[in-house]
């Protein structure tokens, strides 16, 4: 529930907003063992937005969706820091069903972009403007790029202007690039991590 999520954001992260764990029991209490996956609150906030888009119910938007979306965005704001490169980077977190701690985790960066953009749209649709709106806009405009890695030549070979897969189920298929999305920067491992290994 939103009240429990607000309490947990304050208690666990010392921040405003709402935190919802990957595992939550039926009464709305979060499991504290999954507190490093930060994306569930964003996922739920986006469901609220989709419901509003489907129904165009302004009462639902102002009474239910916007409070939840705003609290999700407030929490997500605390997960990012603007570094010397001028970009907002995701602090320590984990990806889906994971335990490896990442900086600039793929899921956190993707959900940040979509959540902050959605929060700004929801506020506009409701005729509301919060003090945080400018911060969220700045984050969206200066968000760290998605984490990517270049694959080895044994996996993808450049052939003229295109690339072909050299192994796996789709061997021989043409692909756009020899770069793939990474999970993020492994804090302990000190390297970009992927679910793929050559």
Where are these regions (language model features)?
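Active-site core of glycosidic bond-cleaving carbohydrate-active enzymes
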Residues: 1, 33-55, 63, 106-113, ...
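Generic marker of "main functional regions" within proteins
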Residues: 4-5, 23, 71, 79, ...
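Helix-terminus loop motifs that line ligand-binding clefts
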Residues: 1-46, 52-55, 59-64, 68, ...
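Short, charged low-complexity intrinsically disordered segments located at boundaries
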Residues: 6-29, 99-106, 142-155, 172
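Flexible glycine/proline-enriched surface loops and loop-helix/loop-strand junctions
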Residues: 28-30, 94-100, 179-183
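Acidic/histidine-rich catalytic neighborhood
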Residues: 71-126
């Amino acid at each position: 529930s939103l009240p429990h999520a607000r309490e947990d954001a304050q208690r666990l992260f010392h921040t405003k907003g709402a935190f919802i764990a990957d595992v939550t029991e039926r009464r709305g209490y979060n499991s504290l063992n999954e507190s490093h996956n930060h994306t569930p609150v964003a996922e739920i906030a986006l469901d609220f937005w989709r419901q509003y888009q489907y129904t165009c119910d302004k009462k639902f938007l102002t009474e239910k969706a916007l409070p939840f979306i705003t609290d999700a965005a407030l929490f997500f704001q605390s997960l990012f820091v603007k570094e010397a490169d001028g970009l907002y980077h995701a602090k320590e977190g984990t990806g889906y069903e994971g335990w490896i701690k990442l900086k600039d985790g793929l899921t956190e960066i993707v959900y940040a972009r979509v959540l902050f953009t959605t929060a700004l749209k929801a506020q506009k649709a409701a005729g509301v403007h919060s003090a945080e709106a400018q911060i969220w806009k700045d984050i969206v405009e200066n968000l760290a790029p998605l984490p990517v890695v270049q694959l080895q030549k044994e996996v993808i070979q450049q052939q003229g202007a295109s690339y072909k897969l050299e192994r796996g189920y789709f061997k021989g298929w043409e692909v756009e690039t020899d770069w793939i999305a990474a999970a993020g920067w492994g804090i302990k491992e000190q390297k970009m991590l992927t679910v793929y290994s050559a």
